[in-house]
C-alpha cells in the first residue's frame, strides 16, 4: 500500500516529524551544526536541529583534526548568502539551501591555511626534487650558452654577407641607372630626329612656296610684256593697212578714174 506524502506548513514541522520517525526506528539522528545554523534559525524563528549529510561526516573522519579550523568570517559570508536567497521557496528548497550552506562552511573549514603534516614518502620526493634542481639549472645554462653562440655566429655571417649584398645591390642599381639613361637617350634621339624632320619639311614647304611665287611673278611679267608687244604689233599693222589703202585709193583714182 502506497503512503501518500505529507504536506507540512513549515520546515520546523517537517524536521520534528523526521526526528520522531528516526527515534521510533531506534536510530539517533546525527546532527552536526555550528553557531551559524543556530543564529540563522533564531533569526528566522525556527528551533531545533537539522540533520547533516553523512558525506560531510565521512570527510571529517578522513582528514586529521589539525587541518580543521573555524572561521568566523565564513559564518558571516554564509549568512549574507542565505539572506540574499528568495523567501518564496518551499520547505524542501529551504532544506536544500541549508544543506548547501553547511557544505560551503565545511569546505571553507577543511581547506585552511594551516599546513598538513607530510609523510615520509612525500618528504623523500621533495628531497629528490631538490637534488635534481642543480642538474636542470646546468642543462638550461648550457642550452642558453649554445643558443647565444649560435646567434652570435649568425650575426657574424650576416655582417660578412652584408658587404657582398651591398656590392650586388650597387651593381644592380648602376645597371638600372644605365638602362634608364640609355632609354632616355634613345627617347631624346628620337625626339630630335622627329624635330629635324619637321623643320626640314617646313623649310622645303617654304622654299617651294617661294619658288612658286617667283614663278608666278615671272609668268605675270612675261605675260605683261608679251601683251604689250602684241599691242604694238597690232598698232603697226593697222597703221600699215591704213597707208596702203590710201595708196590703193589714189592708184585706183588715177588709173581707173574712180
From Swiss-Prot:
<feature type="compositionally biased region" description="Basic and acidic residues">
    <location>
        <begin position="220"/>
        <end position="232"/>
    </location>
</feature>
<feature type="compositionally biased region" description="Basic and acidic residues">
    <location>
        <begin position="162"/>
        <end position="175"/>
    </location>
</feature>
<feature type="coiled-coil region">
    <location>
        <begin position="211"/>
        <end position="248"/>
    </location>
</feature>
<feature type="region of interest" description="Disordered">
    <location>
        <begin position="142"/>
        <end position="258"/>
    </location>
</feature>
<keyword id="KW-0175">Coiled coil</keyword>
<feature type="compositionally biased region" description="Basic and acidic residues">
    <location>
        <begin position="183"/>
        <end position="213"/>
    </location>
</feature>
<feature type="compositionally biased region" description="Basic residues">
    <location>
        <begin position="150"/>
        <end position="161"/>
    </location>
</feature>
<protein>
    <recommendedName>
        <fullName>Lysine-rich coiled-coil protein 1</fullName>
    </recommendedName>
</protein>
Amino acid at each position: 500500500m502506497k503512503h501518500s506524502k505529507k504536506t507540512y506548513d513549515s520546515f520546523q514541522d517537517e524536521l520534528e516529524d523526521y526526528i520522531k520517525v528516526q527515534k521510533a526506528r531506534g536510530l539517533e539522528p546525527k546532527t552536526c551544526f555550528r553557531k551559524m545554523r543556530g543564529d540563522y534559525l533564531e533569526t528566522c524563528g525556527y528551533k531545533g536541529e537539522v540533520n547533516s549529510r553523512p558525506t560531510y561526516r565521512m570527510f571529517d573522519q578522513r582528514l586529521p583534526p589539525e587541518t580543521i579550523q573555524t572561521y568566523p568570517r565564513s559564518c558571516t559570508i554564509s549568512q549574507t548568502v542565505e539572506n540574499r536567497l528568495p523567501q518564496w521557496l518551499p520547505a524542501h528548497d529551504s532544506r536544500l539551501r541549508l544543506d548547501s550552506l553547511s557544505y560551503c562552511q565545511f569546505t571553507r573549514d577543511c581547506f585552511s591555511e594551516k599546513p598538513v603534516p607530510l609523510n615520509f614518502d612525500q618528504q623523500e620526493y621533495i628531497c629528490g626534487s631538490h637534488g635534481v634542481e642543480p642538474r636542470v639549472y646546468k642543462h638550461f645554462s648550457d642550452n642558453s650558452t649554445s643558443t647565444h653562440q649560435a646567434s652570435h655566429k649568425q650575426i657574424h655571417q650576416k655582417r660578412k654577407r652584408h658587404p657582398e649584398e651591398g656590392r650586388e645591390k650597387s651593381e644592380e642599381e648602376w645597371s638600372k641607372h644605365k638602362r634608364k639613361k640609355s632609354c632616355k637617350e634613345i627617347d631624346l634621339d628620337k625626339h630630335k630626329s622627329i624635330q629635324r624632320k619637321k623643320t626640314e619639311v617646313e623649310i622645303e614647304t617654304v622654299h617651294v612656296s617661294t619658288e612658286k611665287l617667283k614663278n608666278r611673278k615671272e609668268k605675270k611679267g612675261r605675260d605683261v610684256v608679251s601683251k604689250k608687244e602684241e599691242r604694238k604689233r597690232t598698232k603697226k599693222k593697222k597703221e600699215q593697212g591704213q597707208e596702203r589703202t590710201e595708196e590703193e585709193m589714189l592708184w585706183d583714182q588715177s588709173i581707173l578714174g574712180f
